[in-house]
């Protein structure tokens, strides 16, 4: 039984790596956004943290092998106690910000540019993300009593998943 947390700051590649690794390992995969936002609603109506914690806990109990990606995995002691290992993805701030802006443009197009209806909202998000510090995640990870695998998120995805596969399986 493996319950793997993939964490790192926004734009580090958590979702990309999580999806790819889950395909290789044949594990169930979820991202934090899957819990915060109902597929039938937009991003304007997130679920409460309590709801998210309960939904995540239920899935972790229902799936023998499970990968979850989030900036941190701080979703209560019930959830934290189920993780068997954590993967921390580090990416420099400049690369992360480029990835985030590109992702935003791919998702929202010109709406996120100056003059667009989402410009202010996206700029606020970019500022929030830009001010986050790796220490926030690292300090939280160090409070866990599980193996932590650190990986460079700027490496090619196939190299990352091969390295992670070998560490998880062996």
Where does each model-flagged region fall?
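Conserved phosphate-donor/acceptor-positioning beta-strand/loop module used by diverse small-molecule
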Residues: 82-103
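Conserved substrate/cofactor phosphate-moiety recognition/catalytic segment
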Residues: 19, 23-62
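Conserved AAA+ ATPase "sensor/coupling" helix adjacent to the nucleotide-binding pocket
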Residues: 102-110
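P-loop (Walker A) phosphate-binding loop of NTP-binding proteins
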Residues: 9
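ATP-binding Walker
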Residues: 12
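Walker A/P-loop
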Residues: 15
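Hydrophobic anchor at the beta1->P-loop junction of P-loop NTPases
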Residues: 6
